[in-house]
Amino acid sequence: MDTKLRKPALWLVIALVIVLAFSWLAQGFNTSFGKVSVSRIYFDTEKGTLSGLLYLPKGAGEASPRPTVVTTHGYLNSAEMQDLNAIELSRRGHVVLALDMYDHGHSAANAGVTGSFFGFWPTAMYDAVQYMYEQPYVLKDAAGNGIIGVTGHSMGGFSSTTAIYLDEQDFAASGIRKIYAGLTHGSDYQWTGMLGFAGMTAIDATVMAENAGGRTLGMLAAQFDEFFFNADGATGGTVRKKDYVATSSAKAYLQQEAPQANTWYDTPDGGKRIIYQPYQIHPWNHFSTKATAHTLDFYKEAFKDYAGALTEIDSGKQTWLFKELAEFAALIGFVMLFIPLVSLLQKLPFLRKSITGTLAPRQHPKPGALRYILMAVGILLPAII
């Protein structure tokens, strides 16, 4: 091989190996190295088409249905923002659907259905629960209640809250609860409390507590959340440390007079509640081993009666971060491709003539009187006008 071509070709091969090797490694961590099948699914609803990434553990099916968790993202994000929860829950045996909300990611609402802030999120999670409840790999109890958890971040958290409320309203008519547990990340009741403007019931902590239906519920409220969990009477502003569990909203939610963070409480309806308060900001919930551990611990407690269908792995043992690192390495390899690839392409007959030698400097003629006249006009004209 021509020595002039050898080095670019070598670097091209190295870059390709990095891309392929680390992409394979990232895919391995995403699927727990073949123990979980990951596929994109689509399903129609009355409002449009929802899509998500389905994480189906090996062996899950009609003969071995599993506790299920539907996770979703915040405003202007997509299902991939829930990779950490989806990977860790699925490798412990849960079926997981990482959902794109309406008009986000691969999901789309029918024309005229959304179009406003209160259009895309209030029912997205509950519509996904309707679909998942009908699937043979999703566990139900002897009475037909779904063993399904709902978890979302920010707007996804608000959607999870409304899903629980709507499920309890439907229970009054059907006698079936499809949602068994719910954990919200980075959301309080700021927006669900305004659902009255959208013709729905406004949901605050008291309404949530009254409609919990004995479910296991939790909240993850970062101590430095930029948007939510303000103290009573406080308004938004610069980032400040917050103690949500001390607010009247949290007390109503936990149904306790002096609750503590990270503590389980039994409720009069037979349910359980907890509020986690990690030392984080709002978006850190997406990329946190601490937040992920809280999620795993929550569902371990929520689904403890169905532990036989799950795999016991300590919540501190997480692999999702290795997937992120592998993807970053693959991205570096992708960037490395460009220089050797361009160098080799320039050797092709079609592009060889595009290479030029050193250009001679341009000869500039001496400025004439016209140049000075135009310069003077350009300076004076703005002042005159």
Could you say what each language-model-derived stretch is?
Residues 2-44, 51-53:
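An N-terminal hydrophobic leader/cap segment in hydrolases
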Residues 317-385:
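Core alpha-helical transmembrane segments of integral membrane proteins
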Residues 30-319:
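Soluble extramembrane regions of membrane proteins in the secretory/endomembrane system
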